[in-house]
């Protein structure tokens, strides 16, 4: 689960990190009122969306008057912001953040991720703040400095000092950086984060450190024990189909193709998409119904696939282990009958109760194409999609 910038900064503040004074606003009047409350004669206004690249897309502006703030709010609120990290439709802008504007002497980078190979939280710091960290890692990896946290002891002051020295901080800034580092380390574990970034972490004209931006990803599997953070989830930033899939514990990711896929198991789902591509087709989605699929979940999965108007054919690929193929067949039959499917459906069933499942499909009277193998299924569904198109 992603947080907006203003939410990330609120969490930073809860852990004692220095952040600019700012007010999230959902209307132009609120934005103008925020400038009065914040004071000063210059403000930074930012569109709040779950995507990077806002500045280059016009979603961040330094405003020197209340009129400019109002114009920015009128321009973006209720609209969609398209960046290099969004699709062509962009993300809806429901909130803008109005912040005080200060002097920046230098931009740094500070972030943390879970390193799967070492099974530790790893902090990364760089003097190349304000840039895409992936680009820095590719072009100049020597400029990224790392510190791995021991899960038994957590973040240590000496690790902060080592990173701070490499960033060229002075004695006072080292104290501030240590406080930020220790706070982030505690927050990362306590809030079940999977990623955090402060880009840039700036040195102000007065020589102090300030978290000028914030990006936080939370482990969705841990939301059951993070009720406060779960309440911050903005579903408008997500694909409505993916939101609906989550309600049924389905793993769904929308893609740009025209062949819908329903598979049990993430590995088999990826393999299914690969073989569709291999035979000249284009998957419309990734959808894993999981090992504990029920008739109801399969029905909802089928309805979810067919809600995409681009879908011209559907491939159901089930290898029955825990999942019984006859239950999958019941779900397919129920969905086809309920939704009124008008596109070809290719079904490949193998494993637990596959014969019974195939028998149910054959006796259903529905226009379902039975496949004898995965290769046959891919060839048939690509051919069917091309015929409809």
Swiss-Prot record:
Q: How is the cofactor bound?
A: Binds 1 Mg(2+) ion per subunit.
PROSITE patterns listed in its UniProt record: ATP_GRASP, SUCCINYL_COA_LIG_3
Q: What class of enzyme is it?
A: ligase
Where, in this chain's numbering, is substrate bound?
Answer: 264, 321-323
Instruction: Write down the superkingdom of origin.
Output: Bacteria
Residues recorded as binding ATP, renumbered to this chain, are 46, 53-55, 99, 102, 107
User: Can you tell me which family this protein belongs to?
Assistant: Belongs to the succinate/malate CoA ligase beta subunit family.
Q: What is this protein called?
A: Succinate--CoA ligase [ADP-forming] subunit beta
């Amino acid at each position: 689960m992603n947080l907006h910038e203003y939410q990330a900064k609120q969490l930073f503040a809860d852990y004692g990190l220095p952040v600019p004074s700012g007010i999230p606003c959902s209307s132009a009047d609120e934005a103008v009122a925020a400038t009065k409350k914040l004071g000063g004669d210059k403000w930074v206004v930012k569109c709040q969306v779950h995507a990077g690249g806002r500045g280059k897309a016009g979603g961040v502006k330094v405003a020197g008057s209340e009129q400019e703030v109002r114009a920015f709010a009128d321009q973006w609120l209720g609209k969609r912001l398209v960046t290099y990290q969004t699709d062509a439709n962009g993300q809806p802008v429901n909130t803008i953040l109005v912040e005080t504007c200060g002097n920046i002497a230098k931009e740094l980078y500070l972030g943390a991720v879970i390193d799967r190979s070492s099974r530790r939280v790893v902090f990364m710091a760089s003097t190349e703040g304000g840039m895409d960290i992936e680009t820095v890692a590719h072009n100049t990896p020597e400029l990224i400095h790392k510190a791995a946290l021991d899960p038994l002891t957590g973040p240590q002051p000496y690790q902060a000092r080592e990173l701070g020295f490499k960033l060229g901080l002075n004695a006072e800034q080292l104290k501030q950086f240590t406080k930020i580092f220790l706070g982030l380390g505690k927050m990362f574990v306590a809030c079940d984060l999977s990623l955090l970034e402060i880009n840039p972490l700036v040195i102000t004209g007065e020589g102090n450190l300030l978290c000028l931006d914030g990006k936080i990803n939370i482990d969705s599997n841990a939301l059951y024990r993070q009720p406060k953070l779960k309440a911050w989830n903005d579903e408008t930033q997500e694909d409505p189909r993916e939101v609906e899939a989550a309600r049924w514990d389905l793993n769904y990711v929308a893609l740009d193709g025209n062949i819908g896929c329903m598979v049990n198991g993430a590995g088999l789902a990826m393999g299914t998409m690969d073989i569709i591509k291999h035979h000249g087709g284009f998957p419309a989605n990734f959808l894993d119904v999981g090992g504990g699929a029920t008739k109801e979940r399969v029905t909802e999965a089928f309805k979810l696939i067919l809600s995409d108007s681009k879908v011209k054919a559907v491939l159901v690929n089930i290898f029955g282990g825990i999942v019984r193929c006859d239950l999958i067949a019941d779900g397919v039959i129920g969905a086809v009958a309920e939704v009124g499917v008008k596109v070809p459906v290719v079904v490949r069933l193998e494993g637990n109760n596959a014969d019974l499942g195939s028998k149910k499909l054959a006796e259903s009277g529905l226009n379902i194409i039975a496949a004898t193998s995965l290769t046959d299924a891919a060839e048939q569904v690509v051919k069917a999609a091309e015929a409809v198109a």
